[in-house]
């Protein structure tokens, strides 16, 4: 019973940390990363379609993304979608290939992005703490129903706290890594 609660809490905490890492990977650094364009949605024959389904995106070099479009007629629509995004990018096309040079980030923009990343990390920490609270509530309910002893409850809560500390540390590590990426010149 307690092991199920701990396993559930661990799984949910892992998912929270993965969601955070996924979220902050979309924040633009000075370095080209294909995941930067993951959020781009293109109108494809009247249906909103993720860019990944219409083209292959690779990092050509440290400051350039290359997009190989599967359907040549979609090139203008993809360019338009990239320009319409709030990423501040200017794509240029040559046939079925679109090149997206990444301009260097200004100091002010870097600081804004760090604020965004810190906010995301705080949401990640809150999520992990909420999962801890849920697990502790379930453990207290077991104690109240006399299904476990007070010693078992204390031990389980200590284990949940260790899990929480571990996952909050992972959130902090992801934040530190992203901040370092943002401050690179």
From Swiss-Prot:
Subcellular location: Cytoplasm
Broad class of where this protein is predominantly found: cytoplasm
GO biological process: cytoplasmic translational termination
GO molecular function (one): ribosomal large subunit binding
An annotated GO cellular component: cytosol
Family matches, as CDD domains: RRF
Keywords, in A-Z order: Cytoplasm, Protein biosynthesis
Pfam families: RRF (PF01765)
UniProt similarity note: Belongs to the RRF family.
Primary role: Responsible for the release of ribosomes from messenger RNA at the termination of protein biosynthesis. May increase the efficiency of translation by recycling ribosomes from one round of translation to another.
Name of the protein described by the UniProt record: Ribosome-recycling factor
The organism of origin for this protein: Photorhabdus laumondii subsp. laumondii (strain DSM 15139 / CIP 105565 / TT01) (Photorhabdus luminescens subsp. laumondii)
The organism's taxonomic lineage, starting at the top: Bacteria, Pseudomonadati, Pseudomonadota, Gammaproteobacteria, Enterobacterales
